Amino acid sequence: DEGPYKMEHFRWGSPRKD
């Protein structure tokens, strides 16, 4: 995930790479 979602999913605490 090389988009704005990349760091966001770590901030949410849910590393979703579906």
UniProtKB/Swiss-Prot annotation:
Disulfide bonds: none annotated. GO terms for cellular component: extracellular region. It is found in: Secreted. InterPro entries: Mcrtin_ACTH_cent. Pfam families: ACTH_domain. Keywords: Hormone, Secreted. One of its GO terms (molecular function) is hormone activity. Transmembrane segments: none annotated. The keyword Cell inner membrane does not apply. Belongs to the POMC family. MSH (melanocyte-stimulating hormone) increases the pigmentation of skin by increasing melanin production in melanocytes. This is Melanotropin beta. It comes from Equus caballus. The lineage of its organism: Eukaryota, Metazoa, Chordata, Craniata, Vertebrata.
